[in-house]
Amino acid sequence: MQSQMYVPPLSKLNKYIIILYVALFILGKILLSNGINLSSYLALTSGGIKSGLIFQLITFPFIDTQFITVLFNCLILWFIGSELENKWSALFYVKFLGVVTYLPGVVFLLMGLIIGKSMNFVPYFGLNGLNLGLLVAYAMIFSERTMLFMFIFPMKAKYFCMLLAGVEMYMALSGNAYSSSWMHLLSMGLAYGYLCYMSYVARGGSLMAYKAKMDREKMKGKLTLIKNEEEEKPKSSDPKYWQ
């Protein structure tokens, strides 16, 4: 029996993201043919923020320059993102996207402001980080499901995610300090950490409860059992042997 690939319905939120993403890609190509580089205005750069282009903090995920990247990102949003949005609520899905997309952007911007001129116009853009975060979430929830690496090689979701993390790590280490792969790895780490924390909260935990638990454990470690030596000494009247 041949296995059939499950295609989830495209969710409303992901449909809007894909429409905006593709529209800006097409607009960027049209403007580039007329000598205008749209990504230089909408991609995130510390130089752009210093120049007053604050909107870059919002627009940077929706800009991309390569057709194949746009295609794969749209497919992941459809196949992976839609299933996760349907499993979660739309509100939780939006929060997750915000964490894995915009927090790395803020970190990238802070790096640019700290490093200075050499990073002023190094851009950060695209949905790669977001989609890697979605794949981490998918691997955590559906770890035993089979996915097709490069649409050819079947492997379990958890191993597929590990492979992608390894590829990003290799690209980060073989590139320069400004490589966007570092931000993609951060997106993956944030996805894992956020879901672990939200799972802990769903079970009734909180940061305050965790701190209180750690404090109790530390207090237990400081407690020492003190024996009363006088009580341990046998009385002369006590029998020395029991039969």
Where are these regions (language model features)?
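Juxtamembrane/interfacial segments flanking transmembrane helices
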Residues: 35-37, 142-152, 197-207
